[in-house]
UniProtKB/Swiss-Prot annotation:
It comes from Saccharomyces cerevisiae (strain ATCC 204508 / S288c). Residues 264-282, 425-434, 493-502 have a biased composition (Low complexity). GO terms for cellular component: cytoplasm; MBF transcription complex; nucleus; SBF transcription complex. GO terms for biological process: cellular response to glucose starvation; cellular response to heat; cellular response to nitrogen starvation; cellular response to osmotic stress; G1 to G0 transition; meiotic cell cycle; negative regulation of transcription by RNA polymerase II; positive regulation of transcription by RNA polymerase II. Coiled coil: none annotated. Keywords: DNA-binding, Nucleus, Repressor, Stress response, Transcription, Transcription regulation. This is Transcriptional repressor XBP1. Present with 195 molecules/cell in log phase SD medium. Residues 138-148, 156-170 have a biased composition (Polar residues). Its main location: nucleus. Residues 435-445 have a biased composition (Basic residues). GO terms for molecular function: DNA-binding transcription activator activity, RNA polymerase II-specific; DNA-binding transcription factor activity; DNA-binding transcription factor activity, RNA polymerase II-specific; sequence-specific DNA binding.
Amino acid sequence: MKYPAFSINSDTVHLTDNPLDDYQRLYLVSVLDRDSPPASFSAGLNIRKVNYKSSIAAQFTHPNFIISARDAGNGEEAAAQNVLNCFEYQFPNLQTIQSLVHEQTLLSQLASSATPHSALHLHDKNILMGKIILPSRSNKTPVSASPTKQEKKALSTASRENATSSLTKNQQFKLTKMDHNLINDKLINPNNCVIWSHDSGYVFMTGIWRLYQDVMKGLINLPRGDSVSTSQQQFFCKAEFEKILSFCFYNHSSFTSEESSSVLLSSSTSSPPKRRTSTGSTFLDANASSSSTSSTQANNYIDFHWNNIKPELRDLICQSYKDFLINELGPDQIDLPNLNPANFTKRIRGGYIKIQGTWLPMEISRLLCLRFCFPIRYFLVPIFGPDFPKDCESWYLAHQNVTFASSTTGAGAATAATAAANTSTNFTSTAVARPRQKPRPRPRQRSTSMSHSKAQKLVIEDALPSFDSFVENLGLSSNDKNFIKKNSKRQKSSTYTSQTSSPIGPRDPTVQILSNLASFYNTHGHRYSYPGNIYIPQQRYSLPPPNQLSSPQRQLNYTYDHIHPVPSQYQSPRHYNVPSSPIAPAPPTFPQPYGDDHYHFLKYASEVYKQQNQRPAHNTNTNMDTSFSPRANNSLNNFKFKTNSKQ
């Protein structure tokens, strides 16, 4: 057995006055009671051997970055091995109570204890309002205090075994989780355990991380014996948990402290990057009831992304593990190119739900747990050895000193340094006096709109010129400019109700306007296109003199013919073949490119003009003809067909 389970005596436990030790303090008091065996600290954890089946069990004992293990893994015996031989134990559970537990009660229990113990710093402010449930004392009253309400009678052991005998392991796991979420009067989830393989040394880090969250949940939410200092103690534990999530493993510049605090308050809020929250209700609610939790609230765990840790910490882990393997096996037995986090990090995704998660080697797991397991350091002695609490406490004190010195100035930094050096100093005052760090700016995402000041600046820079300068550049007369400026000012006025017609009102259409309309109608709004993508705009030609249209001899050239409807000199340019070229030449000149309908329109207009010009010759009074309205005469004048009607 390469990785056995260690034991620790209660007389070697040295706790501090830190509120993070309140859970371990309450458990130690329960263990030291002379009427509540066992007296050993680790004996109350109920360590047992278990076997779990997994398809990747062979990768634990025969990793690909160790040459000797890789060669041994090619045998039939290693290939058939799919069982994980593990040690497993649970943390002692804590049940919330409503009655107050005073300092005198616990001191009297310790005074009657025959087991020697060190200073536990028992004060009302350090006593959690709860009772420890020891595995060996299921039928006895806990030592902390008795609850005011009697507990409901639980099912007997025989009936419970008969009820769960027909269920699979995953069904039992889900049933235990549902039972814990519905009742939820206990702190530790029974499904969370400390598990490690005693053959390969791989540790189930997901279980330790969730047990840490269960304990921190109680330290943050449960009140203390002293109601005055309860809020301060809870605030200190909450700040410590926020610091672990923000600064301990991840890059603290990736998100602000406000975001990490939002995760502590509610799981419905958006979580910071590199951190995912599992399904469940509020994880850390400062206003949660100390005695019981609503049935709708379940344990909510923040998953730890081991691949997203800081690059400096990742390099430290790889180098430390490489040095350990070289010292243990020698450099010839290690395949250095394959020694990377992707290879020594194992993940179980299927099978038994209880062991699904991240598994890491013992050396790496111990290095990571040193950074956050200060509140549970003595509960990890069976897996990491008796030296782990001292190393974890040293790292915590050094880390607290660095953190406080960087976030405080003057007397605050000196007070924090003194508190970090002396374990008997009260840490709560330092945490309360510590100012809140200034939130760091986050990079703006693409979906984020620009700020109001920046948008206003862009609008000012891209503003249009004034209306007066625009009117000056139109090239209008002075009367028109004055009218436009006057009209625009009247439109801006709130008392303006009537509109005045502009002197530049619409006039009768000219021949050019009518020609453009006819061309637009015939072409359906499209321009003519020719081979080689050559565009030839419709050219404007002056109409032939009216005397040519009125001459009978020249009208023969304009006689409508179905075979040749348009004279040759007025044919459409689409009858011409224009050669295509990669470089389009200048458009050739074509004679009067009018269409067929356009030609008939002009012919009709000339006939109307001829009739109107010949009618005064049959009247005695040529200039007194009133058969035509001024509107009609004005339209004929706009056609510009008027000539000398001397025929």
